[in-house]
Amino acid sequence: MKAYALLYSVLASLTVLELAGATGVTSRDSDYGGFGTSDDTAHKARGTSSQCTPFSIALSSSDTAAFDTSFVAISPSGSYGLVQDGLELFLDRPPGQITTKGNVNNKVAEGATINSTFTLLHGRVTFTFSGPSVAGVVAAAILIADQHDEIDVELVGGDPQHWQTNVFAPAPHDDQPLYGVFGEIEDYPRGPKSVDETHSYTIDWNTERVQWSVDNATVRTLRRDDTKKNGALHYPTHPARLQLGIWDASSPAGTSEWARGPVDWNTAPRRMSAKFEHVEIECPY
């Protein structure tokens, strides 16, 4: 994600502090912004014990109490809804006339964002969900810390036969943000698949590496020592919450290019959605 997501991250952090009070739930899906770690700091963090509680929820309108206890919405109430077989996060067409210049729209839709009311430090998190296969639209399931460390799964609608993984934990002395340096485009290993089909995406995170899987097939391992850039490690070391979201990547230009955007609202549905069916946390560390 690019600068648009960073701005939204800052604004959403303020909003959710007002909503959640002492729950400690903050921030928005952003690959960028926050603090990295020096070698010394990261070395100390390697000895940090896991803070993880097993958790499992089948998202459904038949059990709203479990959802209300475990998650808090950043976006307005009308931007999401529980149905019998999942949680739908909506992205609605912006009001008024939308014009496109180059690969940027003059208006960007506000999508739904849901945060967990709890954090974890290390563990295995599986998100079962799908997103729209519409260019310029991104559905995301991420781990995000108050310090803005991130571990991401992203479904880019403009590239529906692949999905993306990323880690972002910038160091304060970087000359410039390392946008996309640790991002990677992944295949679906068991034949042609699409982001608009339901799949189970897993982030397995410990002190030494992050591993991503889809439908129980491991596709990527990023080791802590491989995140060293500019003399500093860029590895997530802080407790993080779960974040579920859908967003419009039609601006700025760099974001839109990454997301194969902008959204063509002449052909795209007026309302699109990502559907999350199940979330599970395992604590093997």
Model-derived regions: residue spans:
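Classical eukaryotic N-terminal signal peptides for Sec-dependent ER targeting/secretion
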Residues: M1-L11
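GH16 jelly-roll
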Residues: A3, L19-S213, A217-Y285
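Hydrophobic h-region of N-terminal signal peptides that target proteins for export
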Residues: A12-L19
